[in-house]
Swiss-Prot record:
Top-level taxonomic group: Viruses
Name of the protein this chain belongs to: Gene 66 protein
InterPro entries (UniProt xref): Calcineurin-like_PHP_ApaH (IPR004843), Metallo-depent_PP-like (IPR029052)
A GO MF label: hydrolase activity
Pfam families, alphabetized: Metallophos (PF00149)
Gene that this polypeptide is encoded by: 66
């Protein structure tokens, strides 16, 4: 049976992020560590959602990261982040679109998935995917606010913050951070389902 995985902010080949992240001593080791974490769990029929920022954002860095992702198993879907060239915030967003579509079966700025609810009531809830959280950043002020989704009460799975926290409840009670900085690995569908149900039970959300 195939699985679905979630991650964000891989920053393949990105020296500055590697130094901040403290997963490895150099970029090559950092990328190899992430490759091992991916390859050890993802099957060829699995789906991997990457919620943005595959690289440093330079043209060379993006091409390198696309090659790295292409070498990994699974079907890949991308939610664009601010370091990804095809994001419409970038003036030259059109230049690398073709290269991205060679690697990913889906490329967009946001998406929606359906998560089953546990318990006697059953049913499901819709959950949004975006690189950006509703609120929060790794800087003192929220950036790229014009590209963030409007909070209409749905749970949001995101990256971008580089926070070690999975649920930043003091900032927002319906956000799930799937970035490498929080997990150090890919997040499984069942882990997402458990977190969504936990939030749904505690907060009550729009389905």
């Amino acid at each position: 049976m195939s699985n679905t995985w979630f991650t964000s902010d891989l920053h393949i080949g990105h020296k500055r992020l590697m130094e901040i992240r403290n997963l490895a001593d150099d970029v090559e080791e950092h990328d190899a560590t992430l490759a091992k974490a991916w390859d050890s769990v993802v099957g060829k029929d699995d789906t991997v959602w990457i919620l943005g920022d595959i690289s440093s954002g330079s043209t060379k860095g993006q091409i390198h990261a696309l090659g790295w992702i292409s070498d990994r198993p699974g079907r890949k879907r991308l939610i664009l982040g601010n370091h990804d060239g095809p994001h419409p915030m970038n003036r030259d967003a059109h230049k690398l679109v073709g290269a991205y579509w060679m690697v990913f079966e889906h490329v967009s700025t946001a998406a929606r998935i359906r998560v089953p609810l546990y318990g006697d009531a059953g049913g499901h809830t819709d959950v949004l995917l975006s690189h950006f959280p509703y609120v929060g950043d790794h800087t003192s002020e929220d950036r790229h606010t014009q590209w963030r989704l409007r909070d209409d009460g749905k749970i949001l799975i995101h990256g971008h913050t580089h926070s070690p926290m999975i649920l930043s409840r003091h900032i927002h009670r319906r956000q799930i951070h799937v970035g490498i900085d929080a997990w150090g690995r890919l997040v499984s569908r069942d882990e997402i389902y458990d977190l969504v149900n936990h939030i749904h039970e505690e907060e009550g959300v729009h389905t």
